[in-house]
């Protein structure tokens, strides 16, 4: 996530896997009961890393995959960060589409709402 500027000339797009990003950033695995409480995929640090990837990616399109992409409560923040593609389980598609359609894109550009 922090090296996207040096990688962007070598890729056509980027995809952020939020499960792995969260696990490595928070040093906590979802399946490990002794640390799973620290697996917080909508933590401000995770949202800031997503925003940094989008900002540093230039004109390369970006996508989010992982459990976070299907959380309708977080979708507005993801869109505000500049993400325009969400990869979710097929069962979540109707709810995600409904959540996205409720948001005005012009109100959701380049601001996650966290302090920098």
PLM region descriptions:
Residues 1-116:
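Conserved alpha/beta-domain cores
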